[in-house]
Design a protein with these regions (language model features):
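An acidic, low-aromatic, low-complexity terminal/linker signal
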Residues: 1-179
Length: 179
């Protein structure tokens, strides 16, 4: 018999700061961290969506963690970061003041809560570390069904051609051209 026990599994997180609070998302969901760029407002989107950005030709909604978690609103600053991550088949961005580090959290330091909603706070769990707590966001639960529907409609409206225009290529016929 062996006295050896398997090491508990660890979860790799990207930790970041929003409104003085420490959050994290599982590293497997993260695509990249980019410098803050102008966030275009998205009419019709839920308040938890700050707007949209263009990431290499892809329109990406920016989730507003401050609104979702009841933190003070802070204007976009050039030093801020946008964490792009996958939630299901949608690429989203999280606006944060700064990314802190990559951390491997042992299972013993994790308290999984499932998709717990504390008021409007959606968390996948809490990582208890010697230097403090990291709130682990649950990206799939970040938007409720009504918010997801509103975001889908707002994105569809934003990608539709302006009213009164044609999608036909080539523009209007030239003057004097026969039809």
């Amino acid at each position: 018999m062996s006295d050896l026990q398997a090491e508990p599994a660890a979860v790799d997180l990207l930790a970041f700061e929003v409104g003085g609070a420490r959050f994290g998302i599982e590293l497997t969901a993260v695509r990249e961290v980019v410098r803050a760029v102008f966030i275009t407002p998205l009419p019709g989107a839920p308040p938890t969506v700050e707007g949209i950005i263009d990431v290499r030709g892809t329109v990406v909604p920016v989730y507003d963690l401050r609104t979702r978690f009841g933190l003070p609103i802070q204007p976009l600053h050039p030093d801020h970061r946008l964490v792009t991550a996958w939630t299901g088949d949608r690429l989203v961005a999280l606006h944060c003041e700064r990314t802190e580090w990559l951390v491997s959290v042992p299972a013993s330091a994790m308290e999984r809560t499932g998709a717990v909603s504390l008021g409007d706070r959606r968390l996948a769990g809490v990582a208890k570390l010697p230097d403090g707590i990291i709130l682990i966001t649950d990206l799939p639960a970040f938007l409720d069904d009504a918010e997801r529907t509103a975001l889908d409609a707002a994105l569809a409206a934003a990608s539709a051609p302006p009213h009164g225009t044609s999608e036909r290529a080539g523009g209007p016929p030239e003057r004097g051209a026969s039809t």
